[in-house]
């Protein structure tokens, strides 16, 4: 029997997930949708020829007994409310980041899920499903390079929109590194510091770009993360981990190499969608399969969403203060201690 999914938010990412569930993945079907723009929601149903009900809001969608699980792909500030309602309705819920716009909001979700006593919430940190990051994780878990000491990483975009602000460099951009790095090294963060190099001529007047974020873990690992969102040349994600006995590096996306007219070259991707499209597919398929086979989700947890929120809050504070700031996490609840989110 197919998992019956409702989608809350039919914008760009919502449509992408509807398309992959309908046309690429197995074991699920879209049976309900809702969006603040009802006309847009209806158009999505028609575009993908869905046998789905268009609901006026998330309350009515979640009240549908034919909905087993929901995808929350709406505007970020609306996520917390929809996720809390889904938990109370005993629905499985996949929520794109952010889980909530504040650490307090994430903690409310954590507490509600603990009350239920069952893992219902998965957060959309798709890099854990990228084959390159999975290879890094396997190498670290197998101690191929000994204990990790330092991590050098970069998150570069060709350009960003006029509404992109300095704090978004960590809240919207670096948040992916924040999640995947603590997963890779299995260590919590201790402190963060933000350094502003010389400003790029490509950055808009209101935006400080590039930025370097220095993160220290409780175990002493030092991470330097470059964020450069106006690099012009492409969408470029880098990660190099220096261990006691060697170095491992995130592989480049697969691409043909060209030898022509005295040059040797390979293409660089220009957007995040192409870079991580396979990871999105694996991520949503895992959400479906875990529910069908285990009756619980197995991807990034609500607690992971809380860690990301606390860490980005500390980064924003460091942007403003220019000082090293503490990452002050609450004690991890026992409920989440037994869950692993390592992908195979």
Swiss-Prot record:
List the protein's name. Inositol 2-dehydrogenase/D-chiro-inositol 3-dehydrogenase
GO molecular function (one): nucleotide binding
Query: What are the protein's UniProt keywords?
Result: NAD, Oxidoreductase
Q: What catalytic activity is recorded?
A: myo-inositol + NAD(+) = scyllo-inosose + NADH + H(+); 1D-chiro-inositol + NAD(+) = scyllo-inosine + NADH + H(+)
EC numbers for this chain: 1.1.1.18, 1.1.1.369
What pathway annotation does it carry? Polyol metabolism; myo-inositol degradation into acetyl-CoA; acetyl-CoA from myo-inositol: step 1/7
Q: Which HAMAP family match?
A: IolG
The top EC class is oxidoreductase
Which purpose does this protein serve, as stated in its record? Involved in the oxidation of myo-inositol (MI) and D-chiro-inositol (DCI) to 2-keto-myo-inositol (2KMI or 2-inosose) and 1-keto-D-chiro-inositol (1KDCI), respectively. Can also use D-glucose and D-xylose, and shows a trace of activity with D-ribose and D-fructose.
Organism in which the protein naturally occurs: Bacillus subtilis (strain 168)
Give a single Pfam family match.
Answer: GFO_IDH_MocA_C
């Amino acid at each position: 029997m197919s998992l019956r999914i409702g989608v809350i938010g039919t914008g760009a990412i919502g449509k992408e997930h509807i398309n992959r569930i309908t046309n690429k993945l197995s074991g699920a079907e879209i049976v309900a949708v809702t969006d603040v723009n009802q006309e847009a929601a209806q158009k999505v149903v028609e575009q993908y020829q869905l046998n789905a009900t268009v609901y006026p809001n998330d309350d009515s969608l979640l009240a549908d007994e034919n909905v087993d699980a929901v995808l929350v792909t709406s505007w970020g500030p609306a996520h917390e409310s929809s996720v809390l309602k889904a938990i109370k309705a005993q629905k499985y819920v996949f929520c794109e980041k952010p889980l909530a716009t504040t650490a307090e909001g994430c903690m409310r979700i954590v507490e509600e899920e603990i009350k239920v006593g069952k893992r219902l919430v998965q957060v959309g940190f798709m890099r854990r499903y990228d084959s390159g990051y999975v290879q890094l994780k396997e190498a670290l878990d197998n101690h191929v390079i000994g204990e990790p000491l330092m991590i050098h990483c970069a998150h570069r975009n060709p350009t960003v929109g006029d509404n992109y602000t300095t704090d978004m460099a960590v809240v919207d951009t670096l948040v992916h590194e924040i999640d995947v790095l603590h997963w890779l090294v299995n260590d919590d963060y201790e402190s963060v510091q933000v350094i502003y190099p010389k400003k790029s001529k490509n950055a808009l007047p209101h935006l400080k770009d590039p930025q370097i974020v220095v993160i220290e873990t409780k175990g002493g690992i030092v991470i330097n993360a470059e964020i450069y969102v106006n690099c012009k040349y492409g969408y470029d994600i880098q990660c190099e981990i220096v261990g006691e006995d060697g170095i491992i590096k995130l592989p480049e996306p697969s691409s043909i190499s060209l030898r022509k007219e005295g040059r040797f070259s390979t293409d660089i991707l220009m957007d995040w969608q192409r870079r991580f499209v396979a990871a999105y597919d694996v991520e949503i398929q895992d959400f479906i399969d875990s529910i069908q086979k285990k009756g619980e989700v197995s991807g990034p947890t609500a607690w992971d969403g809380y860690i990301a929120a606390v860490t980005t809050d500390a980064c924003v504070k460091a942007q403003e203060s220019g000082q090293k700031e503490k990452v002050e996490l609450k004690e991890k609840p026992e409920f989440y201690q037994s869950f692993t989110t390592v992908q195979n």
